Amino acid sequence: MSDNPPATDAQPPVPYQVYKPELEQVPSAIATLLAEYAGIPPEAQKEHIKTVRDQAFKSYPYPCLGRWRFLELDLSRHPLYHSYIVPMMSNDEKAADGAAAGGGKDDWIFLDLGCCLGQDIRKLIFDGGDASRIYGADLRPEFIDVGYALFRDEDKFPRAEHFIAPADVFDFSPESELSKKCDGRVGILHSTSVFHLFDWDQQVAMACRCLQLMTTKNGRVLICGCQVGNVTAGEFPRRLGGGSRYRHNEASWKKMWDEVVRQESSKYEIRAVRAGAEMYGRDQDRVREELAAQRLAQGEDQETASEAKEGGSKEELRYIGRFEEGMRWMKYWVWIDFA
């Protein structure tokens, strides 16, 4: 259990628009991906994206859809993406400075845990990643459906072979689909906007689940991603519904992984663990999106969600979310060396 004191959250509510009816501009990275990977010409992209988004939002009024959040490609902006992840996932010969666990690329897979629409997966494939070794898992199967509508690639990237949904990060059962397909096989695990949904103890449990997914063959594995952090680490109370969520800074992130390794020492022979993070300046729009997504996922804003589902007009604004003092966007990594 964390011994960090609860953090205070004295900020007043801040208006937050769940649904943005118009897409002002297609971000350049996703525009290139849609044109060259999905075969959707630039002049048709905005209408295609809007049509897919609006159809999905009617059934699934998530802020990541309503605010075009799914068009961002977080993995490709991670500091290890170009230097390590792409080279290790490419079809070329393994990087000169060594491969991930097992010594050979055929021995392990890449998993995006909490993959949303699978946008980061498609970007990795487009950048040269070996699609046969790339998997995605998400709690919500509907996100996988929307991803295929957006990228039109089910013929070349079959759902049954590459996606696991629903996937519960707290299900350790060997009978689960996630366990059957991925336990003991993952050399690189990416998970963005998942850890920060939970309190300290739940995050420790999720980290233990991640260890169960990783390959323990002789060599190094990587867990990486992004999440909401805070310059003052601690438990932040939920506005509604009770409970708390833990916000990390770099020190607390390292501390948590040290605890996980100690807790799991009887199961795994871990030679070393090196956890790190970079904290980025406060992006209020981005952080509000993450807060809203959390509350919607946890049933804290069902009334707002229902209104968003029924409406969606330009004139009608729906607001949720509260900005926490000290918030930052945190990019993290965990290197684990199994003996």
Role assignments for model-derived ranges:
Residues 2-178, 203, 209, 217-339:
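Class I (Rossmann-like) S-adenosyl-L-methionine-dependent methyltransferase catalytic domain
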Residues 198-199, 214-218:
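Helix-to-beta-strand junctions that scaffold the AdoMet/dcAdoMet cofactor pocket
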Residues 184-202:
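A short SAM/SAH-binding and catalytic strip from SAM-dependent methyltransferases
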